[in-house]
């Protein structure tokens, strides 16, 4: 059998009964919030200072919304840990699909994450694409659909992740002699569009590892060069939670501490490797006003091209 889409054991992962429940190992507390903010350089006071949170119109401190994923990550576990995603990975590895990379990441934030909350994440696999040839490798896209709730049953948020499972070494190598693409024509922006000041951040090995640890992500290829090389990557690379954590910081640095992020839709492209520089730029459809929904279009680039493109919604 050469097509994983015809394997009954793999098809079983896409049935209504195939659900993974991931519970946070501990209540939400100040320390992981502080570690996340340090890793992403997010100095927004509403995440750690109760007086500041109330001064800016919030009822209390709350965790950065993107942490809803981090709090329910399995953390550093034995490789044989019984997790639905681990089972799927092992089955796909039988077909040579033993490398993964995130293609798209969408989050909707509904209820603030408070100190003391215990979060639970419900994970389902949506579907499996036909085989695709991408720049990084040949494989299949599999979306994961997830809901996060707190101990009271309140929905904290929803997220959807599109993951590429691919065969390492099957991508299209970059041609160093290739001519750079022609610059796109100048964008015509509607009246009232606000341009955000650029933000450039050096990419170091320490930063990439710190972000992965702060987001409770112990995928080896974010910390271990040998594991990254085995995946077909030139070095360790930044995980999606860190990338989106920086994007969220960029949005609220501009909008200010009164802003609340309600969600984002992000497409991931060129990886962030150590020794490079990432630069955020963006535009808003209008100046931010507290209580009024505003959309921010963000772009992050590095020397390889576009790292991510996002639309963030804030109120």
Report residues per predicted region:
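HotDog/MaoC-like acyl-thioester-processing domains
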Residues: 1-21, 102-200, 272-315
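Hot-dog-fold acyl-thioester-processing enzymes
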Residues: 2-104, 170-258
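Generic structural signal for residues positioned in beta-strands
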Residues: 67-68, 106, 160, 210, ...
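A signal for specific C-terminal beta-sheet/loop modules enriched in small/flexible residues
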Residues: 95-97, 144, 256, 269, ...
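Catalytic-pocket segment enriched in acidic/His residues
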Residues: 234-235, 242-287, 303
